[in-house]
Swiss-Prot record:
InterPro entries: Formyl_transferase-like_C_sf, MPG, MPG_sf. The lineage of its organism: Bacteria, Bacillati, Actinomycetota, Actinomycetes, Mycobacteriales. Keywords: DNA damage, DNA repair, Hydrolase. SUPFAM superfamilies: FMT C-terminal domain-like (SSF50486). Its EC number is 3.2.2.-. GO terms for molecular function: alkylbase DNA N-glycosylase activity; DNA binding. Gene3D superfamilies: Methylpurine-DNA glycosylase (MPG) (3.10.300.10). This is Putative 3-methyladenine DNA glycosylase. It is an enzyme of class 3 (hydrolase). Belongs to the DNA glycosylase MPG family. One of its GO terms (biological process) is base-excision repair.
Amino acid sequence: MPIDFLQPADIVAPQLLGCIFTHDGVSIRLTEVEAYLGAEDAAAHTHRGKTARNAAMFGPGGHMYIYISYGIHRAGNIACAPEGVGQGVLLRAGEVVAGEDIAYRRRGDVPFTRLAQGPGNLGQALNFQLSDNHAPINGTDFQLMEPSERPEWVSGPRVGITKNADAPLRFWIPGDPTVSVRRGRPKTRK
């Protein structure tokens, strides 16, 4: 059954693991994601309401929210939940499965497992641009292909944030070498 992006982000997030996500000549298999739950989640960009910067997260679900992180990295979320709710899933890490040569040109001389490891590196490998903001994930610029079989996954605390960090809203494929952060004990296993 296809992913329903009108569901809450914490329901959508683990369904994205193992999906092939393609943009600008590079395809990655998603191995790590984080859910952000809008107004109820102090770590979400949408916690304090809708702004020009975060408007893409307010829907419709299934569209990209691209933003600048730490003043230099372009990171991407997929908006989730009904329009107006402001939830999304941050794409944290993946394995390059097509377009490896293009990813290396964008990322430089890094180990293969680090080509799309971490949200900024993933954004660089896939060449996210601010002009991609609001783009549908299954349109002309982005494609998402679901796996024939869903991988096992675990969840645990999010990383790189201070607010609501202990919430088990980071989801990853256990043992995958492309996962960006290995600290944090899994709280759930599926």
